[in-house]
């Protein structure tokens, strides 16, 4: 009989330990793990401005209030991979890069889609810009021809097929230039890069230009603009508005396409919709637990 009660007591103690462990795991699992892009990212610049994470101080200077404990990732793919592997994660990426490995939440009740971005009912959206020094284009017939292609009907079709918003529904057909010698260096935003890669493929197929003649470097928007300014890149890419200070240094900017910014979470996360204010609070660190959003 004594042995029986000893076994019962041991089982009760084990149960209490297990219950306590479950309780601890539940509490830890409720913490929101914030993932953000690096400084210089056009996606971060647009996201922080649109959500109010970027604030203006009393002296008129802007300050990015992104949560100091956020895990910083240096590309679109890095953000998606990190969020896909963490059930408590939240991040943001280009809508055009979105895939089934993560879940995009509605913002203020509006689900991101081509239609809601196009009609502007989905608020988190921004332009994809290209920029260049006109003198560089004038001295590079291949770059000039490629720019002409980017404004063509065929380019607009590629943009739409890749889930971005085209800028001209009545664009003219591409007409191949006569002098397609030389090379082009294009670089900048990791959000624009996947679309640019598709556009380069289409251009090479239409023009007969070897793909090796066009170098595509994936960095970030700020580097893209700076390298367009100093002439390292024939064409720079930015997933944000081109700044007045950048334009003042002699570059010409054109909108390539429009894109949404998707707020993403793990596929197993039950959250479906967040308000813009909730997003701001999460990414500034004011709200640290998923349960606080209920």
What are these regions (language model features)?
Residues 2-26:
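Sec-dependent N-terminal signal peptides of Gram-positive bacterial secreted proteins and lipoproteins
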Residues 24-294:
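Exported/periplasmic ABC-transporter solute-binding proteins
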